[in-house]
Amino acid sequence: MIYGIGIDLIEIERIKNLQNQTKFIERILTIEERDKLNQYTHEQRRLEFLAGRFTVKEAFSKALGTGLGKSVSFQDINCYNDALGKPCIDYPGFYTHVSITHTENYAMSQVILEKNE
C-alpha cells in the first residue's frame, strides 16, 4: 500500500553556490555518500551527484509527510546504488522506490514509499 509520494527539483547552480559553504556537504551527505562523491573528479558530475542526493532526501521527507527537521534529517537518509546502479534508500518500516534524474541545469528526484506491513 502506498504511504506517500514525494518529488523535488533544484537548480544545479544553487548547489554550486552552496557547496563551498562551511559544512554544507557534511550536513547533507552521509559518510557513505561523501565517499561516493569523492570518487568523482569532474566538477559537473560532482554537482549532479550532490544535487541528486539533496533532491532525493527532500523528496523522501515529503513522501514520509514530515519534511526535514525534527522527525528526519539529511543524515537519517542514506541513498546508495545497488549492483545495477539503481538508487536505493533503506528506511525502517518502508519499501522505497527511488528515481533521480538530472540535466545540465536541474536535478530532480521522486520517492514512493510503501508501508512494510
From Swiss-Prot:
GO molecular function, one term: holo-[acyl-carrier-protein] synthase activity
Enzymatic class: transferase
InterPro entries reported in the protein's UniProt record: 4-PPantetheinyl_Trfase_dom (IPR008278), 4-PPantetheinyl_Trfase_dom_sf (IPR037143), ACPS (IPR002582), P-Pant_transferase_sf (IPR050559), Ppantetheine-prot_Trfase_dom (IPR004568)
Catalytic activity: apo-[ACP] + CoA = holo-[ACP] + adenosine 3',5'-bisphosphate + H(+)
Domain of life, source organism: Bacteria
Keywords from the UniProt entry: Cytoplasm, Fatty acid biosynthesis, Fatty acid metabolism, Lipid biosynthesis, Lipid metabolism, Magnesium, Metal-binding, Transferase
Cellular component aspect of the GO annotation: cytosol
Positions of Mg(2+) binding: 8, 58
UniProt keyword Transferase, yes or no: yes
Lipid biosynthesis listed as a keyword: yes
BP-aspect Gene Ontology terms: fatty acid biosynthetic process; lysine biosynthetic process via aminoadipic acid
EC numbers on record: 2.7.8.7
Pfam families associated with the record: ACPS
Subcellular localization(s) per the UniProt record: Cytoplasm
Required cofactor(s): Mg(2+)
Record's function text: Transfers the 4'-phosphopantetheine moiety from coenzyme A to a Ser of acyl-carrier-protein.
PANTHER family (alphabetical): L-AMINOADIPATE-SEMIALDEHYDE DEHYDROGENASE-PHOSPHOPANTETHEINYL TRANSFERASE (PTHR12215:SF10), PHOSPHOPANTETHEINE TRANSFERASE (PTHR12215)
Family membership: Belongs to the P-Pant transferase superfamily. AcpS family.
Protein name: Holo-[acyl-carrier-protein] synthase
Organism: Staphylococcus epidermidis (strain ATCC 35984 / DSM 28319 / BCRC 17069 / CCUG 31568 / BM 3577 / RP62A)
Source taxonomy: Bacteria, Bacillati, Bacillota, Bacilli, Bacillales
